[in-house]
Swiss-Prot record:
Residues 109-153, 257-322 form a coiled coil. It comes from Bos taurus. Zn(2+) binds at residues 176, 179, 198, 204. Residues 1-25, 72-162, 307-338 are annotated as: Disordered. InterPro entries: TRIM/RBCC, Znf_B-box. SUPFAM superfamilies: B-box zinc-binding domain (SSF57845). SMART domains: BBOX (SM00336). This is Tripartite motif-containing protein 44.
């Protein structure tokens, strides 16, 4: 071990070990600092070089280390060794002052950097706030548009409700389009429901008519096996036609089209029959309800008439009872006079 600059440096020479390590465990010195005069092992030499980059480290040699001691007097070496610690102290003070100045200079730079960072952060925050506001406004606009669309859809549904339209159509079908009366009669010639005025002053004058019950029973009793028979006949004719080798492809196509047209006509007739049955059944239900309502109304009229008659009889009986009561009051008075 060896002490650094000052009086201690003059008194003790280098012992060839690291001055930074513990005295008991100090390894051999490998480098020496020309400014400080301390000896270091390789590890502490690297640390010293990083801490003081302006210091010059040289390889430690025992004979060279003796030149640093005050006893080495050859060629003014002792004077240089005495002056070296003083110069080293001045160099350390200068470096410390420069470090303080550099720290002071770095503080404004750091402050300016922090100010710039704060300004950048404030700008970023303001931009984020603007984006959030725009997003919130866009969401509100979307919500308003969705609400308006929903309201428009509800209004459209209420205005164009298919069930309401179907019910209106059914009610309109139950009335005669020419006279506005209930459809209570069936025209056999036109296969159509009519009202009671159509055969009198309408287009069905002189046509064969029937009641709804008669028309319903007649249509229902008709044989509905025409479609089945037509399909069986179609299959048989197709088999027979396809087995004929003289029939060409074009002839076969034409034959199939003609046969299917016949089947389609049978299907249309069956469809029309089913629709007539539904219309007649609905008209019968309407007529039945109308009859029930008419019966209820006539019953109510009879009840009202009976109530009026009962009230009239009650009034008459009250009027006839008043003179009798007056006569009874006069009779006791006459007996007193007698």
């Amino acid at each position: 071990m060896a002490s650094g600059g000052g009086a201690a440096f003059e008194e003790l020479p280098h012992d060839g070990t690291c001055d930074e390590c513990e005295p008991d465990e100090a390894p051999g010195a490998e480098e020496v600092c020309r400014e400080c005069g301390f000896c270091y092992c390789r590890h502490h030499a690297e640390a010293h070089g990083q801490k003081f980059p302006r210091h010059h480290l040289a390889e430690y040699v025992h004979c060279a280390a003796q030149a640093w001691t005050p006893g080495a007097r050859g060629d003014g070496a002792g004077e240089e060794a005495v002056e070296a610690p003083v110069e080293n102290e001045k160099a350390l003070e200068n470096e410390a002052g420069e470090g303080i100045e550099s720290e002071e200079d770095s503080e404004p730079e750091e402050e300016s950097e922090t100010e710039e960072e704060s300004e950048d952060e404030s700008e970023e925050d303001s931009e984020e706030e603007m984006e959030d506001e725009q997003e919130s406004e866009a969401e509100e606009d979307n919500q308003e548009e969705g609400e308006s669309e929903a309201e428009g859809e509800t209004e459209a549904e209420s205005e164009f409700d298919p069930e309401i339209e179907m019910e209106a159509e059914r009610v309109a079908k139950r009335k005669c389009p020419d006279h506005g009366l209930d459809l209570s009669t069936y025209c056999q010639e036109d296969k159509q429901l009519i009202c009671v005025l159509c055969p009198v002053i309408g287009a069905h004058h002189g046509h064969h008519l029937s009641t709804l019950d008669e028309a319903f029973e007649e249509l229902r009793s008709k044989d509905s096996g025409g479609l089945k028979a037509a399909m069986i006949e179609l299959v048989e004719r197709l088999k027979f036609k396809s087995s004929d080798p003289k029939v060409t492809r074009d002839q076969m196509k034409m034959f199939i089209q003609q046969e299917f047209k016949k089947v389609q006509k049978v299907i249309a007739d069956e469809e029309q029959k089913a629709l007539h049955l539904v219309d007649i059944q609905e008209a019968m239900a309407t007529a039945h309800v109308t009859e029930i309502l008419a019966d209820i109304q006539s019953h109510m009229d009879r009840l009202m008439t009976q109530m009026a008659q009962a009230k009239e009889q009650l009034d008459t009986s009250n009027e006839s009872a008043e003179p009798k009561a007056e006569g009874d009051e006069e009779e006791p008075g006459g007996t007193d006079e007698d």
